[in-house]
Amino acid sequence: MIQAGLRIDVDTFRGTRDGVPRLLDLLDEAGLKATFFFSVGPDNMGRHLWRLARPAFFWKMLRSRAASLYGWDILLAGTAWPGKPIGRELGPLMRRTQAAGHEVGLHAWDHHAWQTHVGVWSAQQLGEQIRRGSDCLADILGQPVRCSAAAGWRADGRVVEAKQPFGFRYNSDCRGRGAFRPRLADGSPGIPQVPVNLPTFDEVVGPGLPREAYNDFILERFAAGRDNVYTIHAEVEGLLLAPAFRELLRRAERRGIRFRPLGELLPDDPRSLPLAELVRGRLAGREGWLGVRQP
């Protein structure tokens, strides 16, 4: 049996409204549980269109055929009008996810703002963004939030420090192999991190890898004897690619791959996890910096 953590990022209003119910049905059909990370504040994701001036982002959007993949309502959200408040309007879907037995955590208050400004925010601004998101999701769920995942994996040592006071059991803020405890500025261990170590659909699909070949590509990258942490998006696998994701789950089962929530990958005693740094780095297929485990 190959153990794998399944992380589902929910970035937008439409992804929550339309993608999450479809994914809940698919996971129920497969008898699987996962971790859902919700964005709960305003949906301003369409403001990323200004990044088209950057060649790397333009190429990524072109390579993944973003307009057909996401739809124009997602690509334009929050541009000419205020972004819809995701948590306020769609909180019942977050409670439904929790009631179905899935792990639920915080992705962001404002996904676009986090990806765009996290690198320059002050410690106070970082804390305020986390607090707003955590308080909103806790009110929706009726219980404290126990885990989080930085939007776009935009995290570094400052983000690690900012999350310390919130009582999360773990965070999934970076890319890399194997759960670890990030080293804080004073040298002490921080809240455990569960990194993602498998590529996402939008990072690899393009001229060299057609959509139809993606399931073959990704299934070959799961391996026994290590943490496999895989991320999908409600806006992709919960919408246009839902049939392909359903087939991926079927094929994964035949290969002995068993998906589970990320929290179940942690040892009973987190003190047994190694210490490592969480630093800024680069990853093929992504535009800009993101958090990576080092070493």
From Swiss-Prot:
EC number: 3.5.1.n3
Keyword set, alphabetical order: Antibiotic resistance, Hydrolase, Lipid A biosynthesis, Lipid biosynthesis, Lipid metabolism, Lipopolysaccharide biosynthesis
Pfam families, alphabetized: Polysacc_deac_1 (PF01522)
Any single biological process term in GO: lipopolysaccharide biosynthetic process
UniProt keyword Lipid biosynthesis present: yes
InterPro entries in the record: ArnD, Glyco_hydro/deAcase_b/a-brl, NODB_dom, Polysacc_deacetylase_ArnD
Pathway it works in: Glycolipid biosynthesis; 4-amino-4-deoxy-alpha-L-arabinose undecaprenyl phosphate biosynthesis; 4-amino-4-deoxy-alpha-L-arabinose undecaprenyl phosphate from UDP-4-deoxy-4-formamido-beta-L-arabinose and undecaprenyl phosphate: step 2/2; Bacterial outer membrane biogenesis; lipopolysaccharide biosynthesis
Coiled coil (UniProt feature): none
GO cellular component: membrane
GO molecular function: hydrolase activity, acting on carbon-nitrogen (but not peptide) bonds, in linear amides
EC class (word): hydrolase
Disulfide-linked positions: none
Catalytic activity, as annotated: 4-deoxy-4-formamido-alpha-L-arabinopyranosyl di-trans,octa-cis-undecaprenyl phosphate + H2O = 4-amino-4-deoxy-alpha-L-arabinopyranosyl di-trans,octa-cis-undecaprenyl phosphate + formate
NCBIfam families named among the record's database cross-references: PRK15394.1
Function recorded in the entry: Catalyzes the deformylation of 4-deoxy-4-formamido-L-arabinose-phosphoundecaprenol to 4-amino-4-deoxy-L-arabinose-phosphoundecaprenol. The modified arabinose is attached to lipid A and is required for resistance to polymyxin and cationic antimicrobial peptides.
Protein name: Probable 4-deoxy-4-formamido-L-arabinose-phosphoundecaprenol deformylase ArnD
